[in-house]
Regions:
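Short acidic/glycine-rich loop or secondary-structure boundary segments that cap or lie
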Residues: 29-30, 45, 64-67, 89-92, ...
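Hydrophobic/aromatic-lined pockets within catalytic cores
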Residues: 10, 25-26, 74, 208, ...
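Acidic, Mg2+-coordinating catalytic module of metal-dependent nucleases/exonucleases
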Residues: 194-220
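Anionic group-transfer/hydrolysis microenvironments
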Residues: 61, 114, 204
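Extended acidic low-complexity intrinsically disordered regions
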Residues: 222-235
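Short beta-strand scaffold segments in enzyme catalytic cores
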Residues: 65-71, 205
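Mg2+-dependent endonuclease catalytic cores in nucleic-acid-processing enzymes, primarily RNase H-like
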Residues: 75-192, 214-215, 232-235
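ATPase catalytic-site recognition across NTP-hydrolyzing enzymes
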Residues: 1-58, 63
Length: 235
């Protein structure tokens, strides 16, 4: 190889260097997660050890349910191994969509704080309805900048490895995560348009922010609300 050519490539700005020197073409101007490297951050599915703790991270709106099953090893390395991506689901059907995919012990289901807001039409919260259906949720942190930096920490590459691996069957997360751009008015935040891109990364953010620095999980569960909801017939 031409050593002088390699040296010139190494002196290029980061994005050009990644593309030309390492063949990392998942990069573009304005990209938020410029740490992204498909070869490092994705892997073919494999059987996860039973002792790994399992979590679900979700984002929900009538326009889209995005939920990810994530296994965590003893060193807090995370493996995103299962994806739910469905639109136009009412709350009960969204809960059933998740329940139908659970065949393992789940330590916690992370969700954004607004899922604890009571709806004006029914007086019930999404979290309460999920709890009544056997899916108690854990309230994540919704500070966007803190959350996105937590994702960046998981994506950081050290000695050719990162703490986050996404199974290749999670095609929508792999498609949307590297496509996110910086917000025009706040470079520390992710642009929330186009909205179609944000649901999947938001769900991942709710997981990463709860595991930054091996932070302790605090479950938030409204038992009184859940008890009153067990007798509901119209969810």
């Amino acid at each position: 190889k031409d050593k002088s050519y390699i040296k010139r490539l190494e002196n290029l700005p980061e994005k050009e260097r990644k593309a030309l020197l390492y063949g990392s073409w998942d990069i573009f101007e304005g990209q938020y997660f410029n740490e992204w490297n498909r070869d490092i951050h994705t892997c073919s599915p494999f059987k996860l050890p039973q002792e790994y703790k399992r979590y679900i991270a979700m984002d929900y709106g009538l326009d889209m349910l995005a939920a990810y099953f994530i296994a965590v090893d003893e060193e807090e390395n995370a493996y995103v191994y299962k994806e739910i991506y469905q639109s136009n689901l009412i709350i009960s059907r969204a809960a059933n969509a998740i329940k139908g995919r659970i065949n393992e012990d789940i330590t916690a289901i992370y969700a954004p704080p607004d899922m604890w807001n009571r709806r004006q039409d029914s007086g019930k919260s999404v979290a309460g309805i999920f709890a009544a259906m056997g899916l108690p949720l854990t309230k994540s942190v919704n500070d966007r900048e803190t959350g996105w930096y937590a994702v960046k920490e998981y994506l950081q590459i050290k000695e050719g490895k990162s703490r986050l691996k996404i199974f290749t069957n999670c095609v929508n997360l792999i498609r949307t995560l590297p496509a996110l751009t910086h917000d025009d008015k706040n470079v520390n935040d992710v642009a929330n348009t186009p909205h179609e891109l944000t649901h999947r990364p938001d769900a991942l953010r709710y997981f990463c922010v709860m595991h930054r620095g091996n932070s302790r999980i605090q479950s938030v569960f409204d038992y009184n609300e859940a008890e009153s909801l067990f007798e509901m017939t119209d969810l």
